[in-house]
Amino acid sequence: MKVALVTGAATGIGAAISRRLASDGMAVGVLDLLSDAARKVADEINSAGGKALALQADITNREQVKAAVARLRDAFGSITVLVNNAGITGSVAFEELTDAQWDRMFEVNTKGTFIVTQVVLPDMKAAGWGRIVNISSSSAQSGAVRMAHYSASKGAIIALTKTLARELGPLGITCNNIPPRFVMNTVMSEKHFSAAPIEAREEWIKAGPICRQGEPEDIAGACAWLVRDETGYVTGQTIGVNGGRYI
């Protein structure tokens, strides 16, 4: 049985990915800063016959991450699948951005991904097999007004993905990224999409050939494909799950 760690797993995309990987037969570490919500997702998985363990950690705190990873390893064994989904968002005009806002965005979105990946990597190296999926954002591809700090932090994730693919490929480890676009029931959706005028929301939805807003399960399906044994020749790629918005 493969063991997967999913960060930001208590709600939205992370919760959907956790459920999907568990349904595919993996033991899943449901890691989030929100311990009660993470426990609820893990309980749902276990009640459905899967295997899951709720974990609490701040991904910017290396010692907390190490402790969470050790708990998951003790429960289920070595971790060979990692989904870096945890992150924050924000909206502020570029000219009004503060150093603190910029630094915090990169600390969580970029440094957090760096820390978790470094902590889990020894398990993958020892196994000679691993799958890393980073959840970035379509904002990193197209840019987003009032979101310079967010877009840049997610763009760094795409660059990190390509670099890890090159470094880790010879070790049997792949690394890919998925940049979602306006997915329902997520922090991004609630803060930006749902708050926009209905005319703007309709225009965004119609911008791609699949005229609907994305669902967390859409991202989970792509992630489940990327972590399969059969996708070992796919690495360093940006898998756009965006309804065809960026063709």
Model-flagged regions — what are they?
Residues 170, 183-208:
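A glycine/serine/threonine-rich, flexible loop-to-helix segment
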Residues 93-94, 101-106, 193, 200, ...:
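Substrate-binding pocket helix/loop in short-chain dehydrogenase/reductase
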Residues 117, 153, 161:
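Active-site helix of classical SDR
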Residues 142, 224, 235-247:
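Short C-terminal tail/terminal secondary-structure segment
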Residues 122, 166-170, 232:
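Alpha-helical segment proximal to the catalytic Tyr-Lys
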Residues 137:
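Residue(s) in the substrate-gating loop at a strand-loop-helix junction
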Residues 83, 169, 174, 234-236:
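Short, small/polar-rich loop/turn modules that mediate ligand/substrate recognition or access, typified
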